[in-house]
Regions:
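Conserved beta-structured recognition patch
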Residues: 144-194
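Hydrophobic single-pass membrane-insertion segments
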Residues: 23-37
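Extended substrate/cofactor- or partner-recognition/assembly subdomains adjacent to catalytic sites
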Residues: 181-213
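Residue-level "edge-of-site" marker
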Residues: 139, 177, 204
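N-terminal Sec-pathway targeting helices
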Residues: 1-17
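Electropositive
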Residues: 39-166
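Residue-level signal for secondary-structure boundary elements
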Residues: 134, 172, 196-199
Length: 213
């Protein structure tokens, strides 16, 4: 009888231990699975499909002006490209810098320093590389300054515009209704929550929100 009771309690303890292992295993496994799935979805949004990539022409990047504007050689001619859907702090003296400073109360030198950081990030990302340029469907081909308005992709499919926002070096530009605007807004939210890039200790992008874009 004693051996039966002993075996009974040993079985109960074993089952309880297995139940606890199963509970805590699922408790910690599910968030990891969700995190992995979220990361996979982020990568999927951040890349051009391989079949589209193979059919697209590549253009060499010749010069980078700031965090959202660069020059590429197209059909033997250098063209200025303004990346769609994003906006970075101004790096150079300009009327926009004056307006940004007046509107936000941030001094010009601080804004330019933030713009320099965004510029250096983009130089590292696309400098001396070849890129794929895609226009916004049913959108304007050029802006009022004559710059081509484009979505930009690296040869490995990386969506440059989105990556700049995801890494915290640009805001989502909200003034125009673009086909990929929701992706940019969501990327900005993630960058801010994770304090990436200029959303970190510098809090460099927060002043941009006051512009009402």
């Amino acid at each position: 009888m004693k051996s039966f009771i002993k075996l009974f309690f040993k079985t109960i303890i074993t089952l309880a231990a297995l139940a606890m292992l199963a509970y805590f295993g699922w408790k910690y496994a599910i968030p990891k699975l969700e995190q992995k799935e979220s990361k996979q979805n982020e990568v999927k949004r951040n890349e051009l499909k391989q079949d589209e990539l193979k059919q697209s022409q590549r253009y060499p990047v010749k010069k980078i002006y700031d965090g959202d504007t660069f020059e590429a050689e197209i059909d033997g001619k250098n063209e200025k490209i303004r990346m769609l859907g994003i906006d970075t702090p101004e790096k150079h003296q300009s009327s926009k810098l004056d307006k940004d400073s007046e509107r936000t109360g941030r001094d010009k030198e601080t804004i330019k320093k933030l713009g320099e950081l965004a510029y250096k990030y983009v130089v590292k990302l696309i400098g001396n590389k070849r890129v794929v340029l895609l226009a916004e469907p049913n959108g304007d081909d050029r802006d009022r300054y004559g710059r081509l308005l484009r979505y930009v992709y690296l040869e490995d499919g990386t969506f440059v515009n989105l990556k700049i926002v995801e890494d915290g070096y640009a805001n989502a530009y909200r003034r125009f209704n673009l086909s990929k605007q929701n992706e940019f807004i969501e990327a900005e939210r993630r960058a801010r929550e994770n304090k990436r890039g200029l959303w970190g200790d510098l809090k460099g992008l927060e002043f941009m929100e006051k512009q009402g874009k």
